[in-house]
UniProtKB/Swiss-Prot annotation:
It comes from Arabidopsis thaliana (Mouse-ear cress). Disulfide bonds: none annotated. GO terms for cellular component: plasma membrane. This is CASP-like protein 2D1. It comes from the Eukaryota. The keyword Cell membrane applies.
Amino acid sequence: MRDNNNNNTREEERSSSSKQQQPQAPMSLKIIDSCLRLSVVPLSVATIWLTVTNHESNPDYGNLEYNSIMGLKYMVGVSAISAIYALLSTVSSWVTCLVSKAWLFFIPDQVLAYVMTTSVAGATEIVYLLNKGDKIVTWSEMCSSYPHYCSKLTIALGLHVFVLFFFLFLSVISAYRAFSPFDPPCDSQTNNDA
């Protein structure tokens, strides 16, 4: 009987202390979440603009544009999707009826984090091949012939990497929001006492 009273008292203390801390943590978390989402928009737009407007002519080799490389088209598409999603999710995160639906943010955040990872990997490979080439498959480096194109593409890739990191943080935040209402698993000693 005494153990039950102690357990009830401990549970009441935990619930009262967590109730006191809850209003503070979600609001600061919500502000961080919104700032990260809003930061994605200009970075993605800048990535798109730098990539799409990037072109350079060389009298020996001709024109080099973003649409001649399939991986850059993919990067532009992913950047556009991430900017639109970030804007819509920022607005909807302040709508009261959607805030309680943590899964509405968790699943797309996870998917976009993975898609951004593939996009960054593909764009990194392109920038690497443009800078270093691949002699085994007879792909020569092109940055000596197109220096402006390569430097602009490197900046776009850097911005795209920042967006990836923001989405990785957002996926952690949305996972915390989705799973925090659930109690942690009980240890075996607690189960034996019950």
